[in-house]
């Protein structure tokens, strides 16, 4: 039996980064259930400090997720952590767009707030390493 996988990215602004990556990938931010969140606060299972408002909606402060229109792709969860990123990622995402679209996509992502870090190639393969707005590295290939 296959096991599902969720990708979790530590960050300082989970809702902002979820919005950014949803735009990058053409995915959607997973909606949060405001009524459920209010009920959890009302019953004492959570506190107001566990919540925040993002784009006019009550959401959990600790995280936000994005999902693909393709249900077979993994969910990506952006999780609030207190410390900033300090070293190179041990795991990173590769955004595959193909050689014919790579330069346009890099330009689009830089326009959305990514930072170009370097370009590389190995044999016939070429990619551009970028950083998202919080400094997490990813590649466009």
What do the PLM-derived regions correspond to, one by one?
Residues 16-17, 100-106:
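Short, conserved charged micro-motifs
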Residues 2-9, 23-25, 31-32, 41-46, ...:
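Vicinal oxygen chelate
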Residues 12-23:
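Hydrophobic ligand-binding cavity/cleft-lining segments
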Residues 36-37:
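Conserved loop-to-helix junction within protein kinase catalytic domains, corresponding to the end
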């Amino acid at each position: 039996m296959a096991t599902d996988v969720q990708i979790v990215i530590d960050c300082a602004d989970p809702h902002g980064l979820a919005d950014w990556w949803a735009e990058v990938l053409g995915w959607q931010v997973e909606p949060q259930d405001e009524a459920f969140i209010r009920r959890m606060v009302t019953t004492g299972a959570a506190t107001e400090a566990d919540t925040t408002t993002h784009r006019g909606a009550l959401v959990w402060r600790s995280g936000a997720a994005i999902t693909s229109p393709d249900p077979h792709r993994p969910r990506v969860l952006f999780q609030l952590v207190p410390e900033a990123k300090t070293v190179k990622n041990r795991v990173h995402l590769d955004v595959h767009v193909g050689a014919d679209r790579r330069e346009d996509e890099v330009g689009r992502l830089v326009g959305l707030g990514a930072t170009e870090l370097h370009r590389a190639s190995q044999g016939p393969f070429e990619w551009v390493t970028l950083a998202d707005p919080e400094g997490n590295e990813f590649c466009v290939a």
